[in-house]
């Protein structure tokens, strides 16, 4: 009886061990599925259908400049420029409504007069009439671009000279800045022209990159066809 009891107990213990072992094996087979490495889904963006490229001429009587711009854009003469009254009639915008984009274009005569905001001792600003000095306007162009440095991942500037004899500087701003493309052109003696591309959306470098790359070629075309017409 004693031997029989031992055999029965051993068999019972063996059955328990087998049960737990089988349970552990089953759980271990399920663990890879439950604890497999998580892979995040790539964030996608809507596909953008870009128009076929084509250009038309902007050449208005009395304007001191001309250039070519895309046929799928609109040249708009606004009454204000960044909520400021226009200082001369030669400030215009190039709108791309399908992209929610706009190129702001401003013009000043070197040696001419412009209204400037002068900071007072109490922190307020007062309008003041000053002379357009070439060096000051170049400095202002760099300052306006560098205002984006807090959100920009990079700011690069490059000097260019076109076949039409136009010299200027182009700025490329990386990251989630409000503007990724800015430039200015001047003959250093009479004319100063500045442009900046903005989007009417929250800046996102990844989602805007395809549109920015597309519009970069249009900006290049504008610069390469640009001429002074007041000579």
What spans do the regions from the language model cover?
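Bacterial N-terminal signal peptides
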Residues: 16-30
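N-terminal targeting sequences that direct proteins away from the cytosol to non-cytosolic compartments
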Residues: 3-9, 15, 32-100, 111-118, ...
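A short, hydrophobic, proline-anchored segment that marks a local hinge/packing element in signaling
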Residues: 182-188
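Short, Gly/Ser/Thr-enriched beta-strand-loop segments that form substrate-interacting elements
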Residues: 166-181
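Short hydrophobic beta-strand segments that form the core of ligand-binding sensory/regulatory domains
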Residues: 194-198
């Amino acid at each position: 009886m004693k031997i029989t009891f031992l055999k029965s107990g051993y068999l019972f213990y063996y059955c328990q061990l087998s049960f737990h072992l089988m349970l552990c094996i089953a759980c271990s087979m399920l663990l890879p599925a439950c604890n497999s490495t998580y892979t995040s889904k790539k964030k996608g963006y809507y596909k953008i259908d870009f128009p076929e490229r084509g250009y038309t001429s902007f050449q208005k009587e009395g304007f001191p400049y001309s250039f070519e711009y895309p046929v799928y854009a609109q040249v708009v003469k606004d009454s204000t420029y960044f909520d400021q009254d226009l200082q001369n009639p030669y400030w215009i915008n190039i709108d791309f409504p399908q992209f929610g984009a706009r190129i702001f274009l401003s013009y000043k005569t070197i040696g001419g007069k412009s209204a400037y905001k002068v900071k007072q001792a109490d922190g307020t600003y007062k309008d003041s009439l000053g002379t357009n000095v070439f060096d000051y306007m170049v400095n202002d162009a760099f300052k306006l671009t560098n205002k984006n440095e807090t959100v920009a991942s990079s700011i690069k500037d490059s000097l260019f000279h076109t076949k039409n004899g136009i010299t200027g500087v182009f700025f490329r701003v990386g990251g989630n800045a409000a503007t990724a493309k800015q430039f200015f052109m001047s003959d250093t003696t009479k004319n100063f022209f500045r442009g900046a591309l903005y989007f009417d959306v929250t800046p996102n470098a990844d989602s805007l990159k395809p549109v920015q790359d597309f519009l970069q070629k249009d900006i290049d075309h504008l610069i390469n066809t640009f001429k002074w017409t007041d000579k």
